[in-house]
Regions:
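Membrane-embedded alpha-helical segments of multi-pass transporters/permeases
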Residues: 162-165
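C-terminal peripheral helix-coil segments that are non-catalytic and often amphipathic
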Residues: 132, 171-230
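All-alpha amphipathic helical-bundle segments outside canonical DNA-binding/catalytic cores
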Residues: 84-85, 121-122, 139-154, 172-178
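Helix-turn-helix
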Residues: 13, 21-56, 60
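Short secondary-structure transition hinges
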Residues: 95-143, 149-150
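Short, well-structured alpha-helical segments
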Residues: 88, 131, 135, 148-156, ...
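Generic hydrophobic, amphipathic alpha-helix propensity
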Residues: 10-18, 35, 61-65, 69, ...
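Hydrophobic alpha-helical connector segments
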Residues: 60, 71-104, 117, 152-155
Length: 230
């Protein structure tokens, strides 16, 4: 078999086709065979040369989507906003970039240790970006002076691992109650991120992620937790 002279183009084509199918058919309904059938003659072997699985494709697609729409890049061009306002812009921009079906699928993958570890690493990196903006806010008076590093890390852990969580499963009412609790914590630290407008965005995120309204979800556990004996 001749070697592929353009591996990067092949990988890009697989990602483009996969994103199109995920959005049209849904992630769960799209199979590897569906992706291969839409690659214009490329084989299943070509797919597995670049990606280990459909889950691997989804992870890479999500990384590309959020890199293309990275609000931390565009915030550098914003003029006249203080540090707190910039953080709110980043937060709302990130929320508006969510693809509901893809994000729900990605959340389900966080039950797998490999993807959870990657999410933790991403959260660590994002906290560093928020730390810079928090320092700016502390300098301009929009955020109470304190430890910017700890505040950024705490905020990311609460929002990324407790509110939006593959471990602590919530229904809609509890999701909002958690957001209010986070608001109380951050307000107490002089970081008034979750104002009325941001709380509306939190509510929209809950809808986008498909957070259920019934209470049955409160008894559910992630797959790795079910393996732990009582």
């Amino acid at each position: 078999m001749p070697r592929n002279k353009y591996p990067e183009e092949t990988a890009k084509k697989i990602l483009d086709v996969s994103l199109k199918l995920f959005l049209e058919k849904g992630y769960e309904q799209t199979t590897v065979l569906d992706i291969v059938d839409n690659l214009g003659g490329l084989t299943r072997g070509a797919f597995y040369h670049h990606f280990k699985s459909k889950e691997d494709v989804l992870r890479t697609v999500m990384e590309r989507v959020y890199d293309d729409e990275d609000p931390f890049k565009s915030i550098k061009e914003v003029q006249g906003a203080n540090g707190l306002e910039k953080i709110k812009i980043v937060f709302s921009s990130g929320a508006s970039a969510i693809y509901p079906g893809l994000t729900r699928a990605a959340m389900s993958l966080l039950r797998q240790p490999r993807f959870l570890a990657k999410h933790l690493a991403d959260t660590h990196d994002t906290a560093k970006l928020f730390e810079t903006l928090i320092e700016e806010g502390m300098a301009d008076g929009s955020i109470r002076p304190g430890n910017a590093k700890f505040l950024a890390e705490l905020g990311m852990l609460l929002l990324n691992f407790w509110l939006v969580s593959p471990v602590f499963v919530s229904n809609k009412a509890e999701f909002i109650d958690k957001a209010v609790f986070i608001k109380q914590i951050l307000d107490g630290l002089g970081f008034t991120l979750l104002d009325e407008e941001m709380m509306k965005i939190i509510d929209t995120i809950a809808e986008t992620l498909g957070v259920p309204s019934d209470s049955d979800t409160l008894s559910s556990k992630p797959s790795f937790a079910k393996k732990i004996p009582p």
